[in-house]
Amino acid sequence: KLNPSKGYDIYRDAIIRILNEFKEWKAFSIGDEKRNKPIIDHQNHYELGYLTHKEVLKLLNRSEIAVVPSRWEEPFGRTALESSSRGCATIISNRGGLPETTDNCIILKKLNSNELYKEIKKLKKKKKYRNKVQNDGFNNIKHLTKENSLIIDAIRESLINKFKLNFIKNKLRIVNIYNL
């Protein structure tokens, strides 16, 4: 959704400055919000509207930087997770579940357009830094959900065998699992 609760106005103000400064760069926005949407009026900005998940992933594969400056407490930052897993240098706010999705993104110290502008500009100007953020995000262990699920399953099976749990007679009532 492209609205102020998702920080779209923060993105708008920062990206207009970036596009004015770096004429060769292009910026894209994905989403279909109809109400209260800030307008980005720039020749190098493209509003793509609604895209399927597959189309979003294709665009992320071709992108260098992704921005998720949400104001509201995101329950889970899927956009940040997917952006980072596709090799984007990902900039996020410190809201809700966003910081938990990757250990290798840039977290805005202050949630405003000037701070976002500075972080995007730093990524643009410092290629080695940008490449490091991209590579570290791409290689983040949190993206390995299939592999992590196999590890958790193996631990569960070993506990069942170790404690000779019988699910018919002695059902587990409560299970609390933390990330290892």
Predicted regions and their residues:
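A conserved mid-protein helix/loop that constitutes part of the nucleotide-sugar donor-binding site
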Residues: 3-17
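Nucleotide-activated donor-binding/catalytic signature segment of Leloir-type glycosyltransferases, i.e.
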Residues: 34-57
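Short alpha-helical segment that forms part of, or immediately flanks, the ligand-binding pocket
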Residues: 57, 80-85, 99-100
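Acidic donor-binding loop of glycosyltransferase active sites
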Residues: 61-75
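Short hydrophobic beta-strand element within catalytic cores of glycosyltransferases
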Residues: 89-92
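Short acidic/histidine- and often glycine-rich active-site loop of Leloir-type glycosyltransferases
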Residues: 95-107
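Conserved acidic donor-binding segment of nucleotide-sugar-dependent glycosyltransferases
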Residues: 106-114, 122-127
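A charged, aromatic-enriched C-terminal amphipathic alpha-helix characteristic of glycosyltransferases
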Residues: 127-173
